Amino acid sequence: VPEPATTELSPVRLQELLLEHPALDGFLAALACDLAGHLAEWDVSGASITVVRPRRQTVHAGSGPGVSASGQSAADPASGVLTTGLPVVVRHLGGRMRQTAAPGAVPGADAAAFASVPVPVPLAGAGAGGAVLTVYSEHPGAFGPEAVQAVERAAAEAAAAVALALRLDALTHRAENLQAALESRTVVDLAAGIIMAQNNCSQQSAVDILRSVSNSRNVKVRDIAAGVVAVVSDRVSTHFEE
């Protein structure tokens, strides 16, 4: 991951990041690095972004290896931001607190201060989680009111790009699920056809046979179907036009 440098957070730059990093975690890591550079004048030495979504794994990415390890526990400042919707700022992070904190609670091993702010990204559904930008400094006393306001402005500027990245990730996830479902359906249909030919029965009767065997063996219908097809074919492929 490149070292943070003073970076202009322009719409064009955000579009470039989306095109260069199609995977959500890669985009968030690159964005965190740019945000750290964009906010360098406010004593920011690193940044991380945490995204919490319903029924999906929490995504956490940082501007460097030390930052990427943070955000993995309930003690992470992002948890407080998501709960209250308000910034969480610690200007003097003592050495004892760093030693006793849960793993991932401190955004960066050398952090002396940090600030976490919400990223205004609308996520559908009740209790849908949210996104949080956390920045940290190696200098105690960082992140006064003006600095926190600058971090909040940066989070607002990045919100549209984060929302688009989340939408693209959701569409990709849905497409992968649909493809898996279609592939599973192909195997079941082929197995049903084989059973129909062998037993001279209807399609529904063939499917019922597969389900009956599935229930008796406590094995998924798709796996039973794959076994039937394997008797007459070594490989089953499903073709998609994209």
Describe the residue ranges of each PLM region.
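Signal-transducing coiled-coil/dimerization helices and immediately adjacent hinge/linker segments
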Residues: R167-E242
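Regulatory loop-to-helix N-cap segments in sensory/regulatory domains
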Residues: Y136-V151
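Signal-transducing alpha-helical linker
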Residues: T6-L9, R13, L19, A23, ...
